[in-house]
Amino acid sequence: TWCLVGSEMCIRDRTHIDTAKEAEAAYKAGIEIISCEPDHHFKDVRKVAPTAFLSVGLKHGLVSSPQEAIKKGFEIMEMGADAIYCSHSINFIEAMAKEGIPITAHVGLVPNLSTWTNFRAVGKTAEEALKVYQNVKDLESAGAACVEVEVVPVELADYITKNTRMITMGMGCGDVCDTQYLFCNDILGTNKGHYPRHAKKYVDILSKEDELQKIRIDGFKMFVDDVKNGQYPEDKHLIKMEEKELDNFLNKIK
């Protein structure tokens, strides 16, 4: 049922956000699928993007059994998630899906394992492509509703999309998937590190943040200088008692 609703929405844009401000901006820009973490920003994200489809991450390693995954999944859904992003094993995904929790799974590049594999496309050889595709079919059989396809060749992503019931969410694999996925820090230019080949920086917020930080520092320096030089506080910043009230006070404490 969830897959059918997703297909009818014909959504092409998805982004991962880190703050409620980013979520609000994405929502107002017309992005209808937003992924985020179940952290202290989440309730505000749900508030500022009331009708967006929220895919909320279940951090890898947060749960150690399928039963814990089910419990945590329901907790996140109760908070306002529409689906749970889960990169755990098939057993976890199958258990959650059987309980009716919509799952977004993952195939392809795993960034947090890049120290082992480097940042590279996955599935460029026939053998590796077959492994990725088999993983997709296993996730489909387990009951996942969506699958993020990350940094795989466009030909493989196209074949996967045409041969799975799941909604495919493509990142770094062309325009052949059901949705187009990019991180907000790539779109907004807030990434201080390496920008991958598939990323596109549309604006440069980082440089603006540097300008704002300089303004903050300048403001604090001016405050320090004023205090040292006796220029703050000025008379207009003071609260004073009427002279008769001051005299009355001093008489009372004698």
Predicted features along the sequence, with ranges:
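Alpha-helical segments flanking ligand/cofactor-binding loops in enzyme cores
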Residues: 24, 43, 70, 74, ...
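Alpha-helix-loop-beta-strand connector modules within alpha/beta enzyme cores
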Residues: 7, 39-63, 90-117, 153-180
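C-terminal alpha-helical cap/extension of soluble enzyme domains
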Residues: 79-82, 166-254
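Flexible, glycine/proline-enriched loop segments at strand-loop-helix junctions
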Residues: 77-84, 120-124, 144-147, 206-211
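Electropositive phosphate-/nucleotide-binding environments in soluble metabolic enzymes
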Residues: 17-20, 28, 39, 63-70, ...
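Active-site beta->alpha loop and helix N-cap motifs at the rims of alpha/beta catalytic domains
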Residues: 15-95, 99-104, 122
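Active-site/ligand-binding-proximal alpha/beta "capping" segment
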Residues: 98, 102, 125-165, 221-225
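Single conserved hydrophobic/aromatic residue that forms the stacking wall/gate
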Residues: 1-6, 10-11
